[in-house]
Amino acid sequence: MTQPPQTSRATIFTRAAVIWLVLICGEILHGIARGIFLVPHVGEFRSNQIGVFTGSIIILIIALAFVRWIGASHPRDLLAIGFLWLILTLAFEILFGRFVMGASWERLAADYNIARGGLLPIGMLVLMLSPLIAAKIRRVA
């Protein structure tokens, strides 16, 4: 029985970057839906808290759908992909939030302050671990 050919690291990380674009599109749609359907009922702050958990589910579903296609099977590579997604997402959130939405630095930082109810660090942890979690569930790693 022959082993399938190994996917190159360049291919793995290119595919991971493509899937990050899918993740960001999913999160943008999630944010729009939250703003339309949830914010009017529970307010912005509570909506953001709920959104961390619903967004984490969306991220895990996308990771589950694409983890085989990405081609990484070693836990080190899967964690590196998660770290790539984390860095890209943080950069996107800061650049988009600050320069497109006009949010203050204090407003951006508030979502990361667990002591004041900001739960985004939990979502970022899920994002970073999602390739590894998905690979374990799919028995890729």
What are these regions (language model features)?
Residues 6-39:
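N-terminal signal-anchor transmembrane alpha-helix
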Residues 15-19, 47-48, 89, 119:
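Short alpha-helical transmembrane interface motifs in multi-pass membrane proteins
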Residues 26-27, 48-68, 84-85, 122-126:
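Core segments of alpha-helical transmembrane spans in multipass integral membrane proteins
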Residues 36-46, 95-112:
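Interfacial helix-loop-helix junctions of multi-pass membrane proteins
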Residues 37-57, 78:
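Loop-to-helix transition at the N-terminal end of transmembrane alpha-helices
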Residues 72-107:
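Mid-chain, well-packed structural core segment of small domains
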Residues 109-126:
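Individual transmembrane alpha-helices with interfacial aromatic-anchor signatures
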Residues 122-141:
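Membrane-water interface at the C-terminal end of transmembrane alpha helices
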